[in-house]
Amino acid sequence: MSEKMSPLSFRQLLTRALAEYEREGSVFGVRAKYVSDGRSLPLFGGRVEMPFGPAAGPNTQLSQNILAGYYAGARFFELKTVQKMDGAELAACIARPCIKADDEGYNCEWSTELTVPQALTEYVHAYIAIKILSKRWELGDPDGFIFNMSVGYDLAGIQTPKMNAFIDGMMDAEHLPAFTRAIEEAQAILPDMAEYIRAIDPHICRSVTISTLHGCPPQEIESIASYLIREKHLHTLVKCNPTILGYDFARKRLDAAGYDYIAFDDHHFKEDLQYEDAVPMFHRLMALAKKEGVSFGVKLSNTFPVDVKAGELPSSEMYMSGKALYLLTMEMAARIASDFEGKLRISYSGGADALHLTELYRAGIWPITVATTILKPGGYDRFLQMARRMGKCSYKVRARVDARAVRALSEAAAGDPLLQKAPKPLPRRTIGRPVPLLDCFTAPCREGCPIHQDVPEYLHLMEKGRAPEALALIARRNPLPFITGTICAHNCMSKCTRHFYDTPVHIREVKLQAAKKGYRALMSAPPEKQSLTSAKVAVVGGGPAGLAAAYYLGLAGAEVTVYEKEKQLGGVVRQVIPEFRIPSVSIDKDVRLVKAAGARFVLGKAAPTYRTLQKKYDYILLAAGARKSALLSIGGRELNAVAFLKAQKAGETPVLGEHVCVIGGGNTAMDAARAALRVEGVRDVTIVYRRTKKYMPADPEEVELAEKEGARFLPLLSPLSAESGRLTCQVMELGAPDAAGRRSPVATDKTVSLPCDTLISALGEKTDLEFLAEYGITPDASGRPPFRSDNVFVLGDLRRGPATVVEAMADALAARDAIVGSPLKYPIPEGAAMSQCSAIERKGVLTVKDPEPRRCLGCQVLCENCVTACPNRANAAIRIPGKAMPQILHLDYACNECGNCAAFCPYDSAPYKDKFTLFATMEDMQESRNSGFFIADREKELLHVRLEEKEFDCCLKEDTPMSRELETFLSTVLHHYEYLLV
């Protein structure tokens, strides 16, 4: 494929918009229709119904992008920057992919990739289309939006003939061929609007934003602004760089918010516009603008240049945006608002989104433009929420920016949890397999769950208040809802698409609510047993793996006996995990549910020998846990964390002394630290870890609880020896980042000594190889036993080493399927699946206050992340007769290989490379390796198709080498989505 975009003609732009709106109720894939309430604000000699819109960038490069934004509620458009270097020359300088917006944003692209004349044509087309469609569809006042040019990067370039023609053409397009031709075509397409179309005002733009390169001298910036104010009489904004804050402040604020890994030095801070030069310059430009009868202000802010250190993008430098930039831009706004006493207009573009928009506006900062938020799932649809929130604001214009309010916003930003970097490295969001050509919508939460819980369905049942049915559905796959509702590692939450919106759905919390509210009903009518197998099964171990196996196999009809050497069931959860983390009553409830499946339990004694079990049972399931304790053995008084916790829970707490050191960084270490703090005589507990706190494997909430309860964290220390009440540790330091950006600890020659009466080692447990040998199990070279050896299965921690409860359950479920000979099947309750209408309503809506089930996006019903995140509308959703799930078609002609869609696909794939692709020409197809098709003859339905590595010509009216599903897909595109064909 090629990164070269092919702009739509005006006829294609307008006819597609009209056809799609009539058939689908959407415009270029945007369903979120905004209709103005009739109010507007005066700005730059015009009026805007909404004081926000897309920033100069990928969302204002093509005409369809701009029209899509307008439809969803945007009314102020900062058009993509135009400069003398353009077209193929500029495109060749941009590394691909060039956008990464999965958390804070990064890009390595800059001004328009079109030629300057092409850019002018795109903006003319978008302007005329909005004028026409706003009236035809009654979306708002056709004069209620504003286009704002963005030009750069030096005065000489701006004064070149092609740039001068661009600026003049935007100011008055009456005699431009692009304008007159579009007006004529529009009249031909919509003859009933001919009179209105002829009268469209050709004055497209009255304002400009100046963008300059880093290192541009203040004299150059002032000369550009003076020229545009004095010679062009344009309302002018100067875009400022965050470097104006100074290196020390920027580094300190970003570090405090968790962005300490973002790499930059001070050279841009030294070379860029300095604050002491900016203030007098802005005063002079304010005076000049007043004299010329136009307005002047600043645009805060430009993106922030940082170094590529972890292969984020294929360049050496990239530009940061989004929530991290908000932290810097708000401080810029606070300083400028204060020093200019609110008299200098501030236009904002630095990580704003729907949750911060109205705060900015009420403080007198507007117009507001956004980029990163609309590059995430929901895309342009996010504008509708912004419009609805703005609709609650007064449109009484402030005379000045409220400096106190802006200062408060800057200070609040520093502590805003939505702007902070996650305390742990972001988990892998994808599900570990490639995206299929068809039927790709999936629930990443379910895919991320080791037992593939029906997460969206039980969330939806809980949303409807149907807790008993929600728990009954949970219990089909999960016999331990109280345990997993309390201490599950919740891999599901790590995959949640809401990570790209605000915060993930708290799925574990909802599961626990379902368990509490639905338990009585479930126990009165537990899951029915089936007769799928008559096997006799012995389970050795009554922890989570053994309990789950007894439940799954018992419900399948097996005759199951569980042998547990302890007097109570529950394994490590019962014997080791402290009561303050999970109460025994919760474990008891799960055990009662498991017992309802009919297994027999033998407690308080060891299981019979392997030979005895072999004679009596068809299958043996080993679920005895990781039985070998790990110790440092470096001297001093040392306890194993598991042994310590087990003793304390049994009421046999040892004397620890005053000073306790816990070695390790997992949940067990946190439990041990919290438990030690509760022991009489203990004055302090120190958690020693050889990496940084950020890389501790413990759950963030467990780390936070340990810290709140008084545990002290000492990272980057590696224990060497313990004696005479002291622990000696080697000081570590972080080495250079690896390819993934992770910095491993490296030993130094420094040591520290800590007071330590007792050392508690939380280093994980090991598999008991001798125990496995008794059952004829031989581990592989890495020491890991096989899942199955003849009729013996190895489950949970015994197989994996220290693992999670839900991973142990996954092993049990896999053993059940192997013994039964078929996967677990069951009906989904009626009404458990979210409707597509409900899923559509939730797309693009940021919320952290709604009830958790309501925040579910229904990804398995309607994903479309790649559709909504694409700024160019290069991924289209195709509805096929007889299929509930829309299919994704990639449009090669609209794609510039920015790569943005790849960040949000739940699969290990890049939709712009891996989804079935429509090519406009055979030449385009030959430049690509995508599976896809070119229409050789539309009337005869002749296609040239590439399917994986095979290419062939075919006719859809005859038999083809393709599947019937793919034939139907292509036929639907030809006959019902002909407006996509160019």
Question: Which residue stretches match the model-derived regions?
Answer:
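N-terminal capping/small domains of soluble enzymes
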Residues: M1-E231
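Glycine/Thr-rich beta-alpha phosphate-binding loop at enzyme active sites
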Residues: E22-D37, G246-G342, P377-Y395, G636
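Catalytic cores of alpha/beta
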Residues: Q64-L67, A352-I368
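Glycine-rich phosphate-binding active-site loops on the catalytic face of alpha/beta enzymes
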Residues: R75-M85, P242, E359-M386
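Ferredoxin-type iron-sulfur electron-transfer modules and their immediate structural context
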Residues: E317, I374, D381, Q385-K536, ...
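Beta1-alpha1 glycine-rich phosphate/pyrophosphate-binding loop at the start
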Residues: Q453-E463, L471, F500, P504-R508, ...
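Feature captures the FAD/FMN-dependent oxidoreductase FAD-binding
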Residues: S531, K536-A538, D588-I634, L720-T728, ...
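Rossmann-like dinucleotide/flavin-binding elements
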Residues: V540-T561, V602-T612, K628-L632, F644-P700, ...
